[in-house]
Amino acid sequence: MRVAIVNDMPLAVEALRRSLAHDPELSLAWIASDGLQAVRRCAADLPDVILMDLMMPVMNGVEATRLIMAESPCAIIVVTSDVLQHTSLVFEAMGHGALDAVDTPVLGRGDPKAAAQRLLRKIRNAGWLIGKKTVALERTTAMASSDTDAALVVIGASAGGPPSLAAVLRALPASFPAAIVLVQHVDAAFTSGMAAWLNEQCVLPVRLASDGLRPEAGVVLLAGAGEHLVLGAERKLHYTTEPRESVYSPSIDVFFHSVAQHWRGRAAGVLLTGMGQDGALGLKAMRERGFFTIAQDRATSAVYGMPKAAAALDAACEILPLGDIAPRLEKVFAPPANPLFN
């Protein structure tokens, strides 16, 4: 894969160059010292992956990400010093389509190869996405529905997800009768901050999903990172390392499949903006189980990858612009029960 570096600090550039050298499948495409240079270089020579700094002269990484994803879209990973000190900027960049974020490796500290591994792992994950490689998951066998009135909304998102999730949650009232579980591709370092940030964006309470917790009406749970979130037969949430071959942990497909298999009440699945195909097969499984499913439309998706894959599989009952998703969910779960679930 051809990787470009966008960073104005010579030491950071050298650290990134040395990190890339540890993987023979990676080559350096070009280096830009500010966001504007990166936008122009992408227009002339599009790399497979961009390692984008945030704080740079002329044009910062957030604005550069926005312009690149609008004009010459490719996989972008935010790589900056101390990402936790720039959480709001990271979420803003992800809102424009950046896939992930990681600290810049530091020269002269510990084993250089070990220090590079976290960055290289994220680059490889991006490679899986742009290569459109997917992990085959077994189709689930639907369990018979019970008479319970429990209602559940599950939402998956990746690149461009944080502001899209906020937009959906912000439009839902405090009286929304369904439990909500979110699966967002994000580094483990950001999950607590993202839950707190989303909690400030809406009237519904948002917190991290903990092992053994049951989804609760009117409460939003965000999947933690590093392991897959699944719904068990007893309707409790659990974390698991299987399947290990999945590109992202948590995987949207893994969670959606578990919902299709074990949830016995009413449910709706929503697949938002994101690169790759994660979630498309799981959304299809939910639709085949009889649940209502939505995919975000092309026009309002920061990255039209996952929703596009869902549309191609006929996994979505409806394809909607972002602003119409929350009102549709309100109608679906409004009393009396929607005929779609009868």
Swiss-Prot record:
InterPro entries: CheB-like, CheB_C, CheY-like_superfamily, Sig_transdc_resp-reg_Me-estase, Sig_transdc_resp-reg_receiver. One of its GO terms (cellular component) is cytoplasm. PROSITE patterns: CHEB, RESPONSE_REGULATORY. Keywords: Chemotaxis, Cytoplasm, Hydrolase, Phosphoprotein. Belongs to the CheB family. Phosphorylated by CheA. Phosphorylation of the N-terminal regulatory domain activates the methylesterase activity. It comes from Bordetella avium (strain 197N). The lineage of its organism: Bacteria, Pseudomonadati, Pseudomonadota, Betaproteobacteria, Burkholderiales. Gene3D superfamilies: 3.40.50.2300, Methylesterase CheB, C-terminal domain. This is Protein-glutamate methylesterase/protein-glutamine glutaminase 1. It catalyses: [protein]-L-glutamate 5-O-methyl ester + H2O = L-glutamyl-[protein] + methanol + H(+); L-glutaminyl-[protein] + H2O = L-glutamyl-[protein] + NH4(+). Its EC number is 3.1.1.61, 3.5.1.44. SMART domains: REC (SM00448). The gene is cheB1. The modification 4-aspartylphosphate is found at D53. Contains a C-terminal catalytic domain, and an N-terminal region which modulates catalytic activity. GO terms for molecular function: phosphorelay response regulator activity; protein-glutamate methylesterase activity; protein-glutamine glutaminase activity.
